[in-house]
């Protein structure tokens, strides 16, 4: 059971590592764009399209803003992956043990070390196995949520970025 719990926790760490790397890359790329004169080029393109006031320029602006919004939404989803959201009360309705002896938040609720140690010593091996099984279940739900957000965030970010770059290239050609 401990091996299964460790495996699920490793998947959670894997997802967090992937997202951290992707967000770091996005940050570096955004820094490069902001530090160079690309911002002025984008501004010139959008100013030109706003002044043009044609159907094609309106479509261009709508697609550009939607793609940028999609990119930002994807980054938001990726950031959400990194925030812990373990609420034991959320899982009590699913039949999961609420007063865990191995979940850090439940351990911290013990007023003293000796109180926690006493609970641990009174715990039978069957109770400990049930606790581990509960933690496997909870961590699996957390892992599933993280990978779902990761996948959606990655797709939204990539699609938004690619479409935005295509629109910027089209805009640069039209100016």
Where are these regions (language model features)?
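Alpha-helical transmembrane segments and their immediate juxtamembrane boundary regions
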Residues: 6, 10-88, 147-175
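Generic N-terminal initiation segments characterized by hydrophobic and/or small/turn-forming residues
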Residues: 2, 20, 98-101
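Solvent-exposed, non-transmembrane helices and loops of integral membrane proteins
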Residues: 88-137
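Acidic-enriched, low-complexity/disordered segments with a strong bias for Aspartate over Glutamate
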Residues: 16, 37, 99, 130-131, ...
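Hydrophobic alpha-helical transmembrane segments and immediately flanking/interface helices
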Residues: 127-153
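Generic alpha-helical secondary structure signal
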Residues: 77, 108, 120, 141, ...
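Cytosolic juxtamembrane N-terminal segments of multi-pass membrane proteins
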Residues: 1-11, 137-143
